[in-house]
Amino acid sequence: MASSFPALQFKVVARCSTTRARVTDIQLPHGLVESPVFMPVGTQASLKGVLPEQLDALGCKIMLNNTYHLGLKPGQEVLDTVGGAHRFQSWNKNILTDSGGFQMVSLLKLATITEDGVTFLSPRDGTPMLLTPEHSISLQNSIGSDIMMQLDDVVHTLTESKRMEEAMYRSIRWLDRCIQAHKRPETQNLFCIIQGGLDKRLREICCREMVKRNTPGIAVGGLSGGEEKHAFCETVYTCTSILPDNKPRYLMGVGYAEDLVVCVALGMDMFDCVYPTRTARFGNALTRKGVINLRNQKFRNDIGPLEEGCSCPCCKTELEGGWGITRAYFNSLVSKETVGANLMTIHNVHFQLQLMRDMRESIIKDEFPSFVKNFFHEWNHGDKSNYPSWAVDALRMVNIDLLA
C-alpha cells in the first residue's frame, strides 16, 4: 500500500507474516525516514548535550522539537527571521513538532480548556494567554517542521467518561480548524491525533472520524500516562485494527524498549520519548540485557564497555574507530561532569536507533517473531518468570507466544 501527499510519500516495504509489524518508507521534505522509527526529543531545538553532527552520525533521520518551548524562546518572530527551526539549530534532517497543548495542560498551573483553545498563565509575567488551534498551526508553520501535530484536547487516560468523550469530539473539531489554518501543506505535513482514553467505543469513533479528514499521517495520543499496561496495549490494538494501511501511524510518548517491540508487533510505525536521553543524565545506560546504573560502585574498576558488541562510538574500541570508553570512566563521571551525560546520551540514542534497525531487518527477513522472543529472553536474562504479563498477553493478540 502507498499514499502520496505534496510533502509526504508513503510506501509499505515489507510485512511480518505473523504479526501486524511492517517496514515502511516515509519520504519527507528533509529526507527518507524508514520505519519502525524512534524519534529522539530535542525539546528546545537541541538534544541535551548532543551536537547536531553527533546525532546525524548516529543515523538519526528525524527528531522532535517542542512547539510550546520554541514559541516562548526564541519566539515566533525570531523563527520567522532565521527561516525556521532547521536553520536555527543547524539540523538538515527532518523535524516533528507537537502542538504545544500537552505542555499547556501538564506543565502549567490553572490551565483551562474551552472550545476556543487552552488558556494558561504566561510563565514570563503571569498574564492569561490563549493557545488556539490556529495559533498552534501558525507557530508550527514558523518552525517549519516536516511533520506538525494538530492541537488536541489532552486529558488523562483515567478521566471520567463524560469529559473524555467531550475531549475526543473537541479534538475532531479542532482538527478541522487546524486544517483550515495550515498555510504550507506543500512543505509541511499535518497529522491528526486519535483520542478517547481507554474507551474502545470512543477510540473507534475517533479513528473513523479522523480518517475522514485524510491527513498525511495519523497519531495515537493520550496514552503512556501511567495507565495499566494491558489496557494500553488493547487500545493500541483497537486503533491499528481500524487505521488505514497506507499512512504512517505514530504512537506518541512511547520509548521503553519493551514497549517499542510490543507496539511494533501491534502495528505502529513511529515513536518518541524523552526517556532514553533523560535517563542518561542520571547515569543509566540502555543495553540488550536491561538498564544498568553506572553510579553503582561495582563499576568503579570495570574496564569493559557499556555493552559488549555495541557499535556506538562510546563502546567501540579505538581500533574499531570508536572512543573505547569504559564503565569505570562513566562511573567516575556520571552526575559530576556534563561530558558523562553527553556520552551516555549518545550511547542510549544509538541503542534506540539500533533496536529499530534490528526490528526493520527482522521484518524484511520475515523473522520478526524470533526477534521478539530473543529480545525478551535477553532482556530478562533468560528467566521467563520475569516476562511482564501485559507483554505476553499483547503479543498473543498478534500470534506470538512468548512462553511457548
UniProtKB/Swiss-Prot annotation:
One protein family per Pfam: TGT
Active-site residues, record numbering mapped to chain: 98, 272
Main subcellular location: cytoplasm
Residues at which Zn(2+) binds: 310, 312, 315, 347
UniProt subcellular location: Cytoplasm; Nucleus
Enzyme class per UniProt: transferase
Names of the cofactor(s): Zn(2+)
Gene3D superfamilies according to UniProt: Queuine tRNA-ribosyltransferase-like (3.20.20.105)
GO CC field: cytosol; nucleus
Protein name: Queuine tRNA-ribosyltransferase catalytic subunit
Organism this protein belongs to: Schizosaccharomyces pombe (strain 972 / ATCC 24843) (Fission yeast)
